[in-house]
Design a protein with these regions (language model features):
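Short glycine-/polar-rich loops that comprise or flank the Walker A/P-loop
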Residues: 6, 33-35, 63-67, 92-97, ...
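Conserved BB-loop
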Residues: 25-59, 75-82, 138-142, 147-150
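Long, contiguous alpha-helical segments
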Residues: 9-11, 37
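Conserved beta-strand-loop-alpha-helix hinge of the TIR/SEFIR fold
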Residues: 56-107
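Short hydrophobic segments within beta-strands
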Residues: 11-13, 99
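Short alpha-helical
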Residues: 15-18, 77
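C-terminal interaction surface of TIR/SEFIR-family domains
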Residues: 1-9, 17-25, 29, 103-181
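Structural signal for conserved beta-strand scaffold positions within catalytic alpha/beta enzyme cores
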Residues: 39-41, 98, 120-121
């Protein structure tokens, strides 16, 4: 099977689902169809009812060109399921992109991933670098999936909306953490 379909697999902790819902919205803006995305917190992107999760995922990894997006956080590294996903993607030599969720730092990256690969830090204080890395990711996905380019003004608006959502979610999570202490 030479021309395998391109698919995105988002590996994240269920505790970080809000971030990933916003990220899927950004992917759809780029032109990725929801049937090309696996993200279990988004109804149109989740694993079909009645399927064995691990069998379904194994088939996806074998039958598709998978690009994994890791949503790294402390929650990620506390989840056996996400660490299993990381191992499976490593064994299959999948292309991957790392998102560092707010509050997570590069020094905490661990596991079988290449720690020298540049990731996107979603709370990077250098907003120019953050926007540049998101644009590079967009361009890579457009090329990889054979998508049409998005209007630059529309992209900037949707990207900024995404970054604002990330900020709001992070602030909400900070409040939840503070109030539970």
């Amino acid at each position: 099977m030479k021309n395998k379909p391109h698919k995105l697999f988002i590996s994240y902790s269920s505790k970080d689902a809000e971030y990933m819902k916003a990220f899927v919205d950004l992917l759809v803006t780029i032109g990725v169809h929801k049937n090309q995305i696996t993200c279990t917190s988004v109804p149109q992107c989740n694993i079909p009812v009645g399927c064995n999760i691990y069998d379904w995922l194994a088939k996806q990894f074998q039958m598709s060109n998978i690009h994994v997006v890791y949503a790294f956080s402390d929650n990620y590294y506390s989840s056996v399921a996400t660490l299993n996903e990381m191992g499976a993607a490593w064994v299959m030599r999948c292309k991957w992109t790392g998102l560092l969720l707010p509050g997570f730092i590069f020094d905490k990256l661990a596991g079988c991933i290449d720690k020298n690969q540049i990731c996107i830090k979603l709370d990077d204080p250098d907003i120019i670098t953050l926007k540049q890395r998101l644009r590079q990711f967009r361009d890579d996905i457009i090329k990889e999936f054979g998508l049409e380019s998005i209007d630059e003004d529309e992209w900037e608006e949707k990207r900024d909306d995404f970054l604002n959502k990330i900020k709001i979610i992070a602030q909400k999570k900070d409040i939840e953490i503070t109030s539970s202490e």
